[in-house]
Amino acid sequence: YDLNGSEAYVFSTYGFGSGVTDFNWRNPLTTSAFGESAIDPDYDLSETFPAGFSPRFGQDDNDFALTGGYRSNNDGRFSYDLSAGYGRNQIEYFMYNSINASLGSASPTSFDIGTLTQSELTFNADFAYRATLDFLAEDMTFAFGAEQRTEEYEIGAGEYASFAIGPLAPEGFPSGSNGFPGFSPEQSGSSDQTSYAAYVDVEAPITDRWTVGAAVRFEDFSEFGNDTNGKLSTRYEVSPNLALRATASTGFRAPTPGQLFSERTSQGLDTTTLNIFTRGRYSPQGPIADVISLRDGVDILPLEPEESENLTAGLAW
């Protein structure tokens, strides 16, 4: 929408999809879920799946994004773009053609496994100025800006039958939905991270054929502190149809809240001790990691940001 030389804008996207895959076939002659139970004499999985079964694992996903802002028309030397954006992606997992054998005859054959949700909210302010300098072939472009970004990751628990340790567990019947146990309430929850960034980018045409550039970006993360990265670039036109270019830069990528705090575990019952055990992947930032690190010779380190150094060169034809 035009506003006297500037414009307001908004755009949005929405996408959805679904998919299903299967796990290996469960042989009724060798799978423990097909055993007989003294606790629940009515349980007979061979009546439900006489030829065995292949658990089916699926997902429904929804993705939504909305961006709006206010920007100049770029006709003058100074231009700007102020914007805000929100995005959300959610995956709902489900299983069917499966069983929680530890629940016996009370077990359903389809399960809601739980949900994973990632959302991001960003605010951006970008500015550019074209300066005329006598010693340059053309105007120098000076760009700068700032960004605030908040990420949130959420795990939603599945239905009780998808992760339950049922009454038949002491007899050796496996717990949780066969193939992929659901997310338990202990695994559910949300975590977030906020970052603030500022950047400066300069590009100068030294001659009609030779252009150089330099950029620096500073970013501060709520979970990691701050980091500074830079880039140097050059481009030389050998002819109207051929150019040489080269770039040297550093990079930084912080782990997301999902990578930092999410856990994926399942529980079972030791038929000898009748103790419940938990196995799976724990967060290196969580309390379990702190306890395990107290053991001799064990030191679980928290996730660190990825850092990189890059050199590129090439031809443009």
Q: In which residue ranges do the predicted regions lie?
A:
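Outer-membrane beta-barrel transmembrane domain signature of Gram-negative proteins
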Residues: 45-47, 53-67, 73-75, 86, ...
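Transmembrane beta-barrel strands of outer-membrane/channel proteins
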Residues: 10-16, 82-88, 142-150, 198, ...
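Flexible, surface-exposed loop regions and adjacent strand-edge segments
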Residues: 24-43, 96-106, 158-168, 230-233, ...
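Repeated loop/turn-to-beta-strand initiation elements of outer-membrane beta-barrel proteins
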Residues: 5-8, 77-80, 135-140, 209-212, ...
